[in-house]
Every structure is written in structure tokens, then in C-alpha cells.
């Protein structure tokens, strides 16, 4: 499993450096299932004009709030409890899904994405930063066991 936890695409720096965040100006990014907010904090530090909202389950958000937010990120990174299987309440410029969909069958991934429809408008971006799984029965048995 170590191989799946390493590499340039697993670090927040890869996402921070390889998406045109500056093109959003003072836009809002919702980090869906954003856990403790570490990725949102990395984005906010590199692109201070952005506002980031970290959404996750209430228990995860409460735990995240126990950690003190760096002073330079106060007012730039917020935490909000939200179940991504319910309608998205925040209008944003980007909805970020980082390592979310590989945990769910396709039908659930579709259900998660459908919850964005009411707040989508022209120009809104849905960013998916996730593992790509090989087609079933195309990798070695060892790899299949590790990734599924």
C-alpha cells in the first residue's frame, strides 16, 4: 500500500501547483470531504485572494476546529459541516473533490455529483483529484487487492 501513498499526485503541492487557482481571482472554493482542511490551507497560503470552505461530516469538522487556524488564514479558510449526499448549500467557483470518489461505487459518486446541480452555473468548475483504478481484472491480483 505504500506505493499508493507516495508520488507527486498525492501531495497537496501537486494540486496547489497544477491548477490555475489565480484565474479565480477572489473566488470561493468548496473542499468537499476536506477533513482537517490541510489541502485548503495549502491552497489558501499559496493563493491568498481565495476563500476556502472545508466541508465534511459534523464530527470531522468539530475535530478540525480544535486545531488552531494559522493567523494568516483566519477569514480565508472556514469549516462547515455538510453531508455531500445532500444538496450543496454554498454557491462557489470551484467544488474540489480530493480522494473522495475512489471510496464509493459509481452510483454513489453520481449521487454526490448530482447534489451540486442546483448551485452550478456557467463557469463553475468541479475539480477531481483522485486515484484512477485499473479496469477490473486487468492488474495483478496483488494490485487488485491493494486498490479495491
Task: Give the location of each predicted region.
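Conserved Class I S-adenosyl-L-methionine-dependent methyltransferase catalytic core
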Residues: 1-27
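Alpha-helical subdomain
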Residues: 17-148
Amino acid at each position: 500500500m505504500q506505493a499508493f501513498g507516495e508520488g507527486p499526485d498525492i501531495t497537496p503541492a501537486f494540486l496547489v501547483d497544477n491548477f490555475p487557482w489565480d484565474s479565480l481571482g477572489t473566488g470561493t472554493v468548496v473542499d468537499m470531504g476536506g477533513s482537517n482542511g490541510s489541502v485548503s490551507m495549502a491552497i489558501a497560503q499559496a493563493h491568498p485572494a481565495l476563500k476556502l470552505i472545508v466541508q465534511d461530516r459534523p464530527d470531522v469538522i468539530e475535530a478540525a476546529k480544535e486545531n488552531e487556524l494559522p493567523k494568516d488564514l483566519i477569514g480565508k479558510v472556514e469549516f462547515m459541516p455538510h453531508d455531500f449526499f445532500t444538496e450543496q448549500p454554498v454557491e462557489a467557483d470551484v467544488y474540489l473533490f480530493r480522494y473522495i470518489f475512489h471510496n464509493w461505487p459509481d452510483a454513489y459518486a453520481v449521487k454526490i455529483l448530482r447534489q451540486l446541480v442546483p448551485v452550478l452555473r456557467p463557469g463553475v468548475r468541479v475539480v477531481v483529484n483522485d486515484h484512477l483504478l485499473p479496469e477490473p481484472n486487468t492488474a495483478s491480483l496483488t494490485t487488485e487487492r491493494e486498490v479495491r
